[in-house]
Amino acid sequence: MATAQEKHLRNVHQLTFGGQNAEAYFSADGKKLIFQSSHGDVKCDQIFIMNIDGSDQHMVSTGKGRTTCSFFYPDGKRILYASTHLASPECPPKPDYSKGYVWGVYSGYDIFTASPDGSNLKQLTDTPGYDAEATISVDGKKITFTS
């Protein structure tokens, strides 16, 4: 956490323990976080939501394939993320890290939206290749993504 010499960060708290946890983003009301995690029985990154204090962590993605790049829509009524679960329910192989950090550009990624509890899953992209890294406009009417 923050060291005694740290001048810019205060009230720093660890919210996740164990596994690999990444890419956490706030809901517009500041009450929740959405993030990707692999831990315990979850061997491949999945999308989770938790309260801002770290309580009530729960998976909202399908539990299949690999997921990444999740966000809340501004109105809080939907979430957005990329997943490989339709290409294969299995976890894709990890990239070769022997030459340093690399991002797994899996051709099976497509972009999905869902309710914050994971229900009402809707596929937004269905093209061959990598569709991920989506972000949402401030008004929630547009998304942009890498393809």
Summary of predicted features, one role per range:
Residues 51-55, 115-119:
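Short loop/turn segments that connect beta-strands within beta-propeller blades
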